[in-house]
Amino acid sequence: MSGLLRYLHCSPAWRVLRPAAPGMQGGRFRSNYAAEEGIEEEIQFAAARQEDPSSLYSDHIPTNAVQKLLLSAGSAVMALYDPYRHDMVAVLGETTGAVALRKLRDQMRRDPEGLQILQERPRIRMSTLDFQTLREMPDGTFGREYARFLDVNHVTPDTRMPVKFVDDEELAYVAQRYREVHDLMHTLLGMPTNMLGEVVVKWFEAVQTGLPMCILGAAFGPLRLNNKRMKKLGVLVPWAVQSGRNARCVLNFYYEKRWGQSVASLREEIGILPPPEIKA
């Protein structure tokens, strides 16, 4: 066992279980290997990864079953200890979500819009979106409200980490797409990025996707809420669960082509129920 742990500690996969660097701020993981380990080591690691013949896509880190098991266990413990370790949440989703990702991929293949997304592989990044145009859209449009969500919560789509541990190129894209539409779900559900908002979104996503990471977050996230927020959660969770069951697969919507659509209209098309009113 000690030999195995030494091997894993030296492997690229084990790097993700190191403590977060001081660059983590505002509830989103903002660190990278260059900040933690030095630019030279990052360049060497990236070059070695690209030269690995078993890599299936640019950020792929191949892992065997034992490595995946240890990564899953380690990331689960760290994610439960600190839910704002979004790097650990990401690793947990990738190492435990193979079955759910295949089901999501199959749903996308059966839907014309979902199939188009799989074929065209759009990305939601600062480099692919014109945020100034989104900010200038009329109030109530999906694009305007998404831009407002990002501005109010001081986040950007680039804070979403690239997929690394999914051993299938198409499933890796499905995982990346889920990750990049997460903030769009916040916008459509009207939820902020605080712990209450994240738990509500996780309940919706758990029902929608079946990803173990979402189920874990939905189940254990409430443990960090105070009594006042638990009362609000008692109203919001049934709505989130019902909306998740009622909604079509949220990955089957080409959101980049719907910025001008009203939030109310898009919610209705997807099947998301109107959010309940919560007393302050």
From Swiss-Prot:
Keywords associated with the record: Lyase, Membrane, Metal-binding, Mitochondrion, Mitochondrion inner membrane, Transit peptide, Ubiquinone biosynthesis, Zinc
Function description: Lyase that catalyzes the C1-decarboxylation of 4-hydroxy-3-methoxy-5-(all-trans-polyprenyl)benzoic acid into 2-methoxy-6-(all-trans-polyprenyl)phenol during ubiquinone biosynthesis.
Gene Ontology CC annotations of this record: extrinsic component of mitochondrial inner membrane
Binding-site residues for Zn(2+), renumbered to this chain: 182-183, 186, 198
Protein name: Ubiquinone biosynthesis protein COQ4 homolog, mitochondrial
Pathway as given in its UniProt record: Cofactor biosynthesis; ubiquinone biosynthesis
Lineage per the UniProt record: Eukaryota, Metazoa, Chordata, Craniata, Vertebrata
HAMAP family reported in the protein's UniProt record: Coq4
Gene Ontology molecular function, alphabetical: 4-hydroxy-3-methoxy-5-polyprenylbenzoate decarboxylase activity
Bilayer topology term: Peripheral membrane protein
Top-level EC class: lyase
